[in-house]
């Protein structure tokens, strides 16, 4: 018996090959679908980016216009008027501050000189560029007291005026008065003078120019009007001039001579009014005592305390004595 397996074997191989072909085709289809999904996603993202670009551009334009708008509004409200600026500080120049600017410039031109330690001079240059104006004089308290400052200015006034070309203008009365007042305030007052000094002094008009009722304080050393106390430079005496000396010539002397006895009977002496206070008293026989000079000891009184004492006791002394 002859059996042939060729036909049967060939049919099975064809079905197997067909099955492989079907599986291969199905796999290709699946791969193609997956790739298509990725492509669709990419195309979708590209469309979204294209749609968002105009919106972003519009937002940027709106933001830029919002930032520029205030400047444009300011330019429109200015009415086309251009504002001037300073070349040095780039600040706006206004037309209404001419006087203030001039005063500020005058203040900027002032300068301070220190001719000696503790002495400060505030100077302002004049228009000629050579001379200066003296604005202020300041003394340091730790170096000078009131009396030392007065003495320094009295001794160095001419030297300072020559050194810094201080000129007193003739055409400026206000400045002239200010300088004169400053000099009068800084110079020490005239101390008490004795009767012998007044006798030697030929010029009696100067002594009679002071009012009898005026009391001026002398910060310097003084000499008593009688024979009791005489002061030299550095004397521990503070003098108070209460009246002009009656032995010199003047209107006061003429009036006194009409109502009083001869000058030969006039007497003066020194009394100690209280500890550290010496008064020079003068009188005619049988007449009221006249207070000629008040002197205070430097050991007990300083410059300020002496002035305070005089203001507190002036009325009482005026009640006891005639000035």
UniProtKB/Swiss-Prot annotation:
Family matches, as InterPro entries: Brevis_radix_dom, BRX-like
Comp. bias regions, Low complexity: 206-220
GO CC terms: nucleus
Basic and acidic residues composition-biased segments: 250-259
Cellular compartment(s): Nucleus
Pfam assignment, any one: BRX
Residue ranges of domain BRX in the record: 109-165, 267-322
Biased composition (Acidic residues): 195-205
Region (Disordered), start-end ranges: 185-259
Biased composition (Gly residues): 221-231
Keywords: Nucleus, Repeat
UniProt record similarity statement: Belongs to the BRX family.
Stated name of the protein: Putative protein Brevis radix-like 5
Organism this protein belongs to: Oryza sativa subsp. japonica
Source species taxonomy: Eukaryota, Viridiplantae, Streptophyta, Embryophyta, Tracheophyta
